[in-house]
């Protein structure tokens, strides 16, 4: 009897919370892309590139690197050890390729970025024991997912979302991996930034 009463009371207490969840209005969330460069930011960038030599050099360096990536092999996760260098290279590749697509409109950059994203989603994990590695990977996928959203297939979107949740978010609930929450170093900022950007994407 006591157990039945406890279950009943718990259910009654949760009903308002469930009802509140159902009433969340998502219509106010900005459409993709919403991270760093919003829709139509490309026009302003193209204009600045024509008048600012320094920014033009940076732009063409990104395009050149993106062109080289088109024939590069995808990244490989080492069998052991940390993967920070791999995560940072994934971030660089996905960020540059996504930028190149948004500014030039050339589909080959988006297609290669999608290939890079699916590749890292296939890693067994993103080294949550050294959560900096995971955070960099989260940021990489957040940018690619958000900036290329309209170009990605529904299957790719689902794969990326699942990887972000399982390999990125779930470890943050595990005390073995979430020490960064209490750190006073840049780990706190970098790790939280990766998690937040992935959540916003």
PLM region spans:
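Positively charged n-region of N-terminal signal peptides that target proteins for export
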Residues: 1-4
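General helical structural elements
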Residues: 6-7, 38
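Bacterial N-terminal signal peptides
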Residues: 7-16
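Aromatic-lined, polymer-binding surfaces characteristic
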Residues: 26, 34-50, 55-63, 67-201
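Beta-rich carbohydrate-recognition and catalytic domains
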Residues: 31
């Amino acid at each position: 009897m006591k157990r039945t009463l406890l279950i009943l009371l718990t259910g009654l207490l949760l009903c308002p919370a469930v009802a509140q969840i159902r009433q969340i209005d998502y219509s106010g969330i900005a459409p993709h892309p919403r991270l760093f460069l919003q829709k139509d930011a490309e026009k302003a960038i193209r204009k600045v590139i024509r008048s600012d030599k320094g920014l033009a050099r940076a732009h063409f360096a990104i395009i050149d690197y993106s062109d080289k990536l088109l024939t590069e092999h995808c990244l490989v996760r080492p069998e052991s050890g940390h993967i920070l260098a791999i995560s940072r290279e994934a971030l660089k590749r996905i960020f540059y390729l996504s930028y190149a697509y948004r500014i030039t409109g050339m589909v080959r950059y988006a297609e290669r970025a999608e290939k890079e994203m699916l590749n890292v989603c296939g890693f067994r994990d993103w080294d949550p024991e050294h959560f900096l590695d995971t955070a960099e990977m989260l940021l990489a996928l957040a940018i690619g997912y958000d900036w290329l959203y309209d170009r990605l297939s529904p299957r790719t979107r689902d794969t990326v979302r699942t990887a972000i949740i399982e390999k990125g978010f779930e470890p943050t609930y595990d005390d073995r991996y979430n020490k960064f929450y209490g750190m006073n170093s840049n780990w706190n900022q970098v790790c939280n930034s990766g998690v937040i950007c992935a959540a916003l994407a």
